[in-house]
């Protein structure tokens, strides 16, 4: 196919997302009531997990994305274990329209990081003497929308 003057039409360069690095930025696991917390329990513990995503531009087309995973397990009002993980990646993103850049950084990049963070948490909990904690998959689209709605509501609040 040609553009009318005998030359093929110009195509826009294809979008690219490259993972330059992945790393544990910060990690903590606490088992404050051991060895008592390791005894068999009649009921499963109550487990609470929080997920947050942050990003910063570190070079012209490079973004550091930090996936924060924090959680704790409690049984009968006592803390069994807690963990905090900041797992990060540096991503190079080129040929992406500006209006698509923020969602790409805040949805797709953490989606790529999540399986690695999940493995770190599962291994740490297992190594702490408990059954591995297998985190459920995260809907990063919903998380992104919730954060955008929260930011919009905060901006509408009178100062």
Curated annotation (Swiss-Prot):
GO terms for biological process: protein folding; protein tetramerization; protein transport. The keyword Protein transport applies. Keywords: Chaperone, Cytoplasm, Protein transport, Translocation, Transport. One of its GO terms (molecular function) is unfolded protein binding. GO terms for cellular component: cytoplasm. The keyword Membrane does not apply. It is found in: Cytoplasm. Its main location: cytoplasm. SUPFAM superfamilies: SecB-like (SSF54611). Belongs to the SecB family. Homotetramer, a dimer of dimers. One homotetramer interacts with 1 SecA dimer. One of the proteins required for the normal export of preproteins out of the cell cytoplasm. It is a molecular chaperone that binds to a subset of precursor proteins, maintaining them in a translocation-competent state. It also specifically binds to its receptor SecA. This is Protein-export protein SecB. It comes from Nitrobacter winogradskyi (strain ATCC 25391 / DSM 10237 / CIP 104748 / NCIMB 11846 / Nb-255). The gene is secB.
């Amino acid at each position: 196919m040609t553009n009318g003057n005998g030359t093929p039409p110009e195509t826009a360069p294809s979008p690219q997302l490259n993972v330059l690095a992945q790393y544990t930025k910060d990690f903590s696991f606490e088992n404050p009531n051991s060895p008592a917390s390791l005894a068999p329990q009649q009921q499963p513990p109550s487990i609470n997990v929080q997920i947050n995503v942050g990003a910063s531009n570190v070079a012209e087309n490079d973004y550091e994305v930090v996936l924060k995973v924090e959680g704790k397990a409690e049984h009968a009002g006592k803390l069994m274990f807690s963990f905090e993980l900041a797992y990060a990646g540096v991503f190079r993103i080129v040929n992406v329209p500006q209006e698509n850049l923020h969602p790409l950084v805040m949805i797709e990049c953490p989606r790529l990081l999540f399986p690695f963070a999940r493995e770190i948490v599962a291994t740490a909990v297992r190594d702490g003497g408990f059954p591995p904690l297998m985190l459920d998959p995260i809907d990063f689209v919903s998380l992104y929308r919730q954060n955008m709605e929260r930011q919009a509501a905060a901006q509408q609040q009178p100062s």
